[in-house]
Regions:
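Active-site diphosphate/adenylate-binding microenvironment
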Residues: 34-37, 44, 52-55, 60-65, ...
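Short hydrophobic beta-strand segments
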Residues: 48-49, 234-236, 401-405, 460
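Thiamine diphosphate
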Residues: 133, 137-142, 287-290, 333-335, ...
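N-terminal amphipathic/basic-hydrophobic helices that include classical n-h-c signal peptides
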Residues: 1-25
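N-terminal alpha/beta PP-like core and its mobile active-site loop of ThDP/TPP-dependent enzymes
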Residues: 21-357, 479-482, 517-518
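Basic phosphate/pyrophosphate-binding loop/patch that engages nucleotide-derived ligands
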Residues: 180, 397-398, 474-479
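Phosphate/pyrophosphate-binding active-site segments
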Residues: 25-28, 165, 203, 319-406, ...
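Conserved short loop/turn motifs at secondary-structure junctions
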Residues: 237-243, 378, 459-461
Length: 568
């Protein structure tokens, strides 16, 4: 592969842009399609892009230095994708990647898969071979037989831009997905002869935005009647309801209705609210409140295994009437069968529903929630030491954004961690279930929310997937805390092998000295062996301008019974 050009974009605001435009007029230089793309992205409200420049994408970078877009250079395209994911989850706005063709795109497919599984808006812009070379198989640099077909498996749609004139409407299609459909990655590839073509004539005029769908009037009326008649209603909210937090609270309080959340909906109700069940529908006590309900209203959830059957207890089958609301009509026909299926955005539905309801109901909501919460400490998979650990994090850094990987503490966080607000907790253990997510995703979240403390929680095995991205964080001046939960290899997999009567193989991996490695990458680092030393390290991390790695040995903080976290 040819050497990549390492460019650093400097965001110097409108003044820099004005100077650049003046020079262009004086020289009479054309504006390439790559430059015009940057201008259009800025007009769409994009302020950050993640990518590694390469020979096939230099035209995207021609316009960056004079724009209002900040460019962040990861150390691997997988890091770019996970940074974009973290940025998007923290804000609700699409994270944007610039990728070279071939290996640049394939390196980002895992983040795209994770984002697709969790409905995270992401715009992936890549190069591709020139139009006359597409599908020829002649051995051109970075060539794939059908790059778009590969990307289409991990995106809402993948499009090859055949003419510069199509750029505004193709971008409009992408943002229509983000604004009005179930979000996820959108991939746009630009052939090399198109990205360099003249786009000077294209106006920076956005297409009208597309509003999300609202419910049919008859469906809203029927839902209101069913909810009004119920005496033990329960609401289940997924990631599709996060943007409707105010409406969720209003409806829950009007109907005196307990609210059960999935991982992606943590924090939608304020923690400690009398109607917030918290925990997880994978836990027995929470399942019971659903089974005891005489009506369930489900908003923006797929009823997927990693939220509703993480402990492999068997499928949850609701026997009561079920109202399902989803922005994706296909989801209404998956997993749980609804009594009433409503194709609508959750917020639009709740706003239509509220005036149809009568006066405040009395359905013993707080009492039912208290019963669930009282039962949680007796659950086989509840761990008091993890509860102490999570409470320490929140006390040290109030309002933190906690970004988890597929690692032991995040599994317990599914049912024991309560986020302070929407978009303040997310992890990769659901959906795609990838490793190496937390470090780059936390960097993306911090870039999106610079005034909020951000903590990555990752295992010693997972950390080795993307540890190099700490160098990108140090270069960008991103002050996150990274807790490396060290349990000496792939501990959960080892326990699973032992439980299945398999001699463990491939799980006892050697780890570097994480403290020294972090310092070598330009970060700060410490080891925490007690709750107080962890608290101090977290506080110290907030006064720096680089990531702080905090290594924690599992045995210093918790003890586990033999057999693995998911075994009784």
């Amino acid at each position: 592969m040819l050497a990549r050009h390492h460019l650093r974009a400097r965001n110097q605001g409108p003044v820099r842009q004005t100077v650049t435009e003046t020079i262009m007029v004086e020289k009479g230089a054309m504006v390439t399609c790559g430059e015009k793309l940057v201008q259009l992205l800025e007009s769409h409200g994009v302020d950050t892009v993640f990518g590694i420049p390469g020979n096939h994408t230099v035209e995207l970078y021609r316009g960056l230095a004079g724009s209002g877009l900040r460019h962040v250079s990861p150390r691997h395209e997988q890091g770019a994708g996970f940074m974009a994911d973290g940025y998007a989850r923290a804000t609700g706005r699409p994270g944007v990647c610039f990728l070279i063709s071939g290996p640049g795109l394939t390196n980002a497919l895992t983040p795209m898969m994770q984002a697709l599984a969790d409905s995270v808006p992401m715009l992936v812009i890549s190069a591709v071979a020139a139009r006359h070379q597409l599908g020829m198989g002649e051995g051109h640099l970075h060539e794939l037989p059908d790059q778009r077909a590969l990307a289409s498996q991990c995106s809402r749609f993948s499009h090859t831009l055949m003419r510069a004139d199509e750029l505004p409407k193709v971008l409009a299609r992408a943002f229509a997905v983000f604004d009005s459909e179930r979000p996820g990655p959108v991939h746009i590839e630009i052939p090399l002869d198109v990205i360099t073509s003249d786009a000077s004539h294209l106006e920076i005029e956005l297409w009208p935005s597309v509003a999300p769908p609202g419910p049919a009037i008859a469906a809203a009326d029927e839902a209101a009647a069913m909810l009004t008649a119920a005496s033990r209603p329960v609401m289940v909210i997924g990631g599709g309801a996060v943007s409707a937090a105010d409406e969720v609270l209003q409806i829950a309080e009007r109907l005196d209705m307990p609210v059960v959340n999935t991982v992606n909906a943590k924090g939608t109700l304020p923690p400690g609210h009398a109607l917030a069940v918290g925990s997880s529908p994978s836990i027995g006590a929470v399942r019971q409140i659903l089974l005891d309900a005489d009506l369930v209203l489900a908003l923006g959830t797929e009823f997927g295994e990693t939220d509703f059957d993480m402990l492999f207890a068997g499928d949850l089958v609701l026997s009561c009437p079920l109202i399902r609301v989803d922005i994706d009509a296909r989801q209404l026909c998956r997993n749980q069968r609804p009594t009433l299926a409503i194709h609508a955005d959750s917020g639009e539905f709740l706003r239509r529903l509220l005036p149809l309801l009568g006066p405040a109901a009395t359905n013993d909501g707080p009492a039912r929630v208290r019963a669930v919460r009282a039962a949680l400490p007796d659950e086989a998979h509840y761990h008091s030491q993890f509860q102490d650990f999570f409470e320490l994090l929140q006390a040290a850094l109030p309002g933190l954004v906690l970004v988890g990987d597929s690692t032991l503490p995040t599994y317990y966080a599914v049912w024991q961690y309560e986020a302070s607000a929407p978009r303040r907790y997310f992890h990769s253990a659901t959906g795609g279930g990838t490793l190496g997510y937390a470090i780059p995703a936390a960097l993306g979240a911090k870039l999106a929310l610079p005034d909020s403390p951000v903590v990555a929680l990752i295992g010693d095995g997972s950390a080795q997937f993307t540890f190099a991205e700490l160098a990108a964080g140090a270069a960008a001046g991103v002050a996150i805390a990274v807790i490396i939960w060290n349990n000496a290899g792939y501990s959960e997999i080892e326990q699973g092998m032992l439980a299945a009567g398999i001699t463990p193989v491939g799980v006892d991996i050697a780890a570097p000295d994480f403290v020294e490695a972090a310092i070598a990458l330009g970060c700060a680092a410490a080891r925490a062996t007690t709750p107080e030393s962890l608290r101090r390290a977290l506080l110290d991390s907030q006064s720096r301008h680089v990531p702080t790695v905090i290594e924690v040995m599992q045995t210093d903080f918790i003890s586990l019974p033999a057999g693995g976290w998911y075994r009784d």
